[in-house]
Amino acid sequence: MTRKGEDTEATMSPASVSILWETPYKVIEFPKLVDGKAYFYHAIGTDDDEKEFFNHGNALLGAFDAAGNLLWSWHLWCAEFDPADEQVELGGEVMMKRNLGAGVVSGTSEEDILASYGVYYQWGRKDPFVGPRYYNMADSADAQVYDSQNLRVYPEYAATDAERGSAGYASAHAMTFITGTKESGYNWLQTADASLWGTEKNNNDPCPKGWKVPSKEVFAALHIKDVISPELEKNYGFTLSDGTNEAFFPGAGRRSFYTGALTNMNDNEVRPTPWTGYYWSSTGEGKEAYAMDFSFDINGTRAGSSFQGAALQYAAGGMQVRCVKIR
């Protein structure tokens, strides 16, 4: 029997495992199932020129039954860092300094800005969706991802309805971004369920073992530490503080609750949309859930910013997650 997540009681009997998607450069290879356990290869070491390498990135590994139905999936986050060395006491909790799925904390190059975004989650779902292909979200293009045969694969987008609007369907269709409708209150669920993440860690919580999605109270305790500065403009984000400690949060945009498209900034010269950051909390309320959001203008002709530590957002939206330690 194979375990689902961290719950020792939630088991299954898969027939195979396979890569649903992974970011470029073969984050993992050769997945196989042996005696109910999933194995895979991750390359790390030195190349022919004796240069050290580590395959950074994200992957989604799926377990399937004999008919090819997806039974469960695991997000594999491969990053060269130790959370114990990159954490900060913030808002009353011990928080990671980088977004879930991110390759770096922050950066000024286009490559590092993009790597700092991490992956995107619909509220209450355990499986991530990839971020943009370009740091500025040009054409709303998704990052390129590949399956076990190294073939390009793409996320699917489908509106919630009586069939798709359930946690069971979402788990069995991990690559389908379930968009909200007016009738659903722009929730991907047909019947809202605030317990999918909640205050206690469960199998839907996407954070690594020992970590969880923070409650709304954590973000509500934060504020913008500095006004817009040239340095912040280079990093595309804000340093947030609880009055004692601080951490950087990239303005990584979000996926639309209505279309699933990646959005952050448009080219309207009259009223340019500022760069934005959206971070889910674990706190749901009715058909919506609380998130932290901020925006800042990098137009250069004016300075402006906004910040909400805990505001209700449509649950079908895809946003970042910043994990806190369970203690």
Regions from the PLM with identified roles:
Residues 1-201, 315-327:
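Short, compositionally biased
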Residues 60, 102, 180-327:
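C-terminal, surface-exposed recognition/capping segments
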